[in-house]
Regions:
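Family-specific signature for flavin-dependent thymidylate synthase
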Residues: 1-166
């Protein structure tokens, strides 16, 4: 999920930031709307960076790692050092399960696996997740530190964070 928590600034901040570059002040709402559309259409993004947004999001860890790789932001993530992680894992939909691409090392084939093969993959993933979480709980029950017990958890485990961008 993605939930907007808070924001600072808005349309007025965006248009004022854009107009400062040519010394113009406040205009009408209609002109402001036109300017915002113009900025978006022509990819003039710096005025939009004047607005600060804070989101609460939840996603599998492997998605989270890709997300922050491509965007500079401030974030506070749930910590497996301080919290017992919930048993919630990502299992891809059957139509998203495909073989490794033969010509793209980073991707998969465009055609999904057969429904039968996809069902088998989903069952194997679920079984692996259940076993990993069972081991995690057993380690915690033995008194192993959370920061060590969590290493058995797969990247498909869901995480959540507050993510702030400008």
């Amino acid at each position: 999920f993605v939930r907007l928590v808070d924001y600072l600034g808005g349309d007025q901040r965006i248009v004022q930031a854009a107009r400062v570059s040519y010394g113009a002040g406040t205009k009408s709402y209609r002109q402001d709307k036109g300017l915002i559309n113009y900025l978006l259409r022509n990819e003039h993004t710096s005025p939009f960076e004047q607005v600060i947004l804070t989101f609460h999001t939840k996603m599998p860890i492997f998605v989270a790692r890709q997300w922050v790789r491509h965007r500079t932001a401030r974030l506070n993530e749930i910590s497996g050092r301080y919290s017992v992680m919930e048993e919630e894992f990502y299992i891809p939909a059957p139509d998203q399960i495909a073989l490794q691409s033969s010509d793209n090392k980073q991707g998969r084939e465009s055609e999904p696996m057969s429904p039968e093969d996809a069902a088998t993959v989903r069952e194997e993933l679920a079984r692996g997740y259940e076993e990993a979480y069972r081991i995690y709980e057993a380690l915690l029950d033995r008194g192993v530190a959370r920061e060590l017990a969590r290493v058995v958890l797969p990247l498909s485990l869901y995480t959540e964070w507050y993510w702030q961008i400008d």
